[in-house]
Design a protein with these regions (language model features):
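PLP-dependent class I/II
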Residues: 1-268
């Protein structure tokens, strides 16, 4: 909404899945659409929400080369960078090379990690002086970029040693939740697929096969879940026409209860 409210049009470059079901960037599509629509402002998501990809250095380098060739300023949403699973590693987009450092506005926050979205504690990292001046000028007019005293102290606490301990323990909990959910989907939910996320606490399940076999709509599946207390989100908001977005940031006992209800009442 912020983009549209600013009078801009959104052009999407959809991710694609390879033969192993891993979500990938479509660099050719990205380059084509940037040229076709004369785009010079790109919003990039790393780690990706909702598919959970943690982009590796080669992938990030290829993406930044496309943006460099087309003279694009990049806003890199790295709000999920604390929630990294297994042995994956988040690589800040600005660390790829000097050009990436110059043309990128990186956005961070502790809201996802510590559940502090209501405190308005997000911040940006900008190295280019011209871009920095432009952002400062716009934010000073709206005051939207201003933090309050409480959010400042929350940020300090989050980035303390105690905060790091919390983050590490949180990732362990989420990893166990993901293990359970993926195993449950693969073994007990016929017609539902999901690629294991590498980061975030979101699942992006694909119900295409189930919808075709059951002759149901995604809306009907979503409603049947809500009717039995399963809170989930329509994946069409994320260009997944047969997908549902599920939040796994909760105790494992609740994850088990939710998936048991899916099998008993929804995917039947």
């Amino acid at each position: 909404n912020s983009i549209k409210n600013a009078g801009r049009n959104i052009i999407y470059s959809n991710l694609i899945q390879d033969e192993d079901g891993v979500w990938r960037m479509d660099y050719q599509d990205m380059d084509q659409k940037i040229k076709q629509h004369k785009i010079h402002f790109v919003v990039f998501c790393s780690p990706h929400n909702p598919c959970g990809r943690v982009w590796n250095k080669d992938e990030l380098t290829k993406a930044m080369e496309v943006y460099k060739q087309n003279n694009c300023i990049v806003v890199s949403d790295e709000i999920w960078s604390d929630i990294i699973l297994d042995d994956h590693k988040h690589i800040p987009l600005q660390s790829i090379n000097e050009d990436a450092k110059r043309r990128t506005i990186a956005l961070y926050a502790v809201s996802k990690t510590f559940n502090l979205a209501g405190l308005i504690g997000s911040y940006h990292v900008i190295y280019d002086s011209y871009i920095k001046d432009r952002v400062r000028a716009q934010s000073s007019k709206s005051h939207y970029n201003s933090m309050n005293v409480l959010s400042i102290h929350a940020l300090i606490g989050a980035y303390s040693n105690t905060g790091k301990e919390w983050k590490d323990e949180l990732n362990q909990v989420i990893s166990k939740n993901v293990d359970y959910a993926i195993q449950f989907i693969n073994n007990k939910l016929k017609g539902v697929q999901c690629t294991r996320p590498e980061g975030t606490y979101m699942l992006f399940i694909d119900c295409k096969e189930y919808l075709e076999e059951s002759n149901k709509t995604l809306e009907e599946v979503l409603n049947s879940g809500w009717d039995v207390g399963i809170g989930w989100q329509d994946g069409r908001q994320f260009l997944g026409n047969t997908h549902i977005r599920i939040n796994l940031a909760l105790p494992l006992s609740k994850v088990k209860e939710a998936f048991d209800r899916m099998k008993k009442y929804v995917f039947i």
